[in-house]
Amino acid sequence: MYAVFQSGGKQHRVSEGQTLRLEKLDVETGATVEFDKVLLVANGEDIKVGAPLVEGGKVVAEVVQHGRGDKVKIVKFRRRKHSRKQQGHRQWFTEVKITGINA
């Protein structure tokens, strides 16, 4: 059984027991989160596709941890001007474990 849901402007295909990183959620570690923007639920041959959302569809997850991703370096370089600008960025994320899929 798997489902496709929307969170943080992105769509994720998940199944029970899977862990994934989402955009940062303002929820405490160990808390339960419910995602109700479910776009598709499939259980073997039984597939429910929403238009745009599946009615009564819900993905339940448990927050494992919060953290920051790998550093991305941003460099702006002007040729022949002896000028450059360097910056780094680390995006916050929330890691969740999928505990249930309801349709």
From Swiss-Prot:
Disulfide bonds: none annotated. It comes from the Bacteria. Keywords: Ribonucleoprotein, Ribosomal protein, RNA-binding, rRNA-binding. GO terms for cellular component: cytoplasm; ribonucleoprotein complex; ribosome. GO terms for molecular function: rRNA binding; structural constituent of ribosome. Transmembrane segments: none annotated. One of its GO terms (biological process) is translation. The keyword Ribosomal protein applies. Pfam families: Ribosomal_L21p (PF00829). Part of the 50S ribosomal subunit. Contacts protein L20. This protein binds to 23S rRNA in the presence of protein L20. NCBIfam families: L21. Belongs to the bacterial ribosomal protein bL21 family. This is Large ribosomal subunit protein bL21. The lineage of its organism: Bacteria, Pseudomonadati, Pseudomonadota, Gammaproteobacteria, Vibrionales.
